[in-house]
């Protein structure tokens, strides 16, 4: 839901949720060689998306080396498709770092790690927004929404009054 709220906020109305899976023939080469973990974690993501009623596509050979992921694919203003947001299931790194927890049966287990980037990286998001809005950003997104420029010294007191009212109204 957080993804949908962000997309609505930024006016992104066309996107595709993608279950990015491994390519079985590349286990041990491009992907961590854990076939059972791949099967389980890809199934977990599929179940979550299905139960949430989220339409999605599945693409093989798009996973991270350490696990499957949900990528949110969007098209830029010039029609280029790219991943804006992602949630990645990492079953490899916790084991490599020796991370464990104690389960309800008092047994040590290796956790799954989730990597989340609901709005991508800062750089990718800013690049997308510049292209998406063609530089014509909505007022709420501008770091400076209003600039008061008194044209004579006698207008300064009134400009200060306006400034106070605008700040009180939440304008920047």
Label the predicted regions.
Residues 1-172:
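NTP/phosphate- and nucleic-acid-binding module
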């Amino acid at each position: 839901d957080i993804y949908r709220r962000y997309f609505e906020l930024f006016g992104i109305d066309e996107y595709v949720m993608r279950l990015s899976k491994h390519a079985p023939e590349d286990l041990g080469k491009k992907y961590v060689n854990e076939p059972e973990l791949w099967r389980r974690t890809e199934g977990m993501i599929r179940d979550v998306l299905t139960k949430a009623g989220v339409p999605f596509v599945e693409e093989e050979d798009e996973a991270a080396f350490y696990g499957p992921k949900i990528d949110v694919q969007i098209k830029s203003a010039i029609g280029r498709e790219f991943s804006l947001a992602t949630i990645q299931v990492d079953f490899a790194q916790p084991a490599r770092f020796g991370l464990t927890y104690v389960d309800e049966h008092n047994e040590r287990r290796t956790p799954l790690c989730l990597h989340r980037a609901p709005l991508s990286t800062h750089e990718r998001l800013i690049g997308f927004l510049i292209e998406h809005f063609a530089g014509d950003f909505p007022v709420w997104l501008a770091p400076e929404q209003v600039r008061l420029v008194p044209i004579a010294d006698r207008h300064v007191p009134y400009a200060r009054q306006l400034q106070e009212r605008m700040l009180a109204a939440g304008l920047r």
